């Protein structure tokens, strides 16, 4: 069991990486020998928290892309969001491979439960990376049709991102508490999701009213609501 994990992780570490990607390597899962499956799961949850922090950084790039008017700078940010999606895929795969190796050994029922939970968490974190890349594609389509968001629309999106970022903070905090065996209440997570949903509903209602009053361009509103919808999905991924 230990030898298998060592071989898998050694292969991960030795795979060539571009300089830009070195910050996204596995941080807590290493090629050293593991004493027990329990220790391995402790390392895995730390890696998952690190994964969540990387994912939160991706939201920052999405915000920057939404606020960027210069086409060249936007393309740089769009490329970063595509890269973050690829990084999320890779990290999910590497953690899942590690967990799979751990689960092949003799493990307790409680450890197996933890591993199953971790599989679900890394799947949701990977989906968060997909959402960031989806936002970049929505913005690219908007730009290709020579549409843009006015200052008020961008202000509303930034407010939505603030709420989503707070949900990220709560998710990471809860993961940390769970790793320490101190998580007893996750009502803060459900409250964060409800806040995201309520704000999404408010923005949608406002936009429908603006369209009915002919105060907004329909196609621009579609792009705007698509961005808001993608941000709302991110809240769902954090809670599921």
Label every PLM stretch briefly.
Residues 1-240:
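Cytosolic, long alpha-helical scaffolding segments
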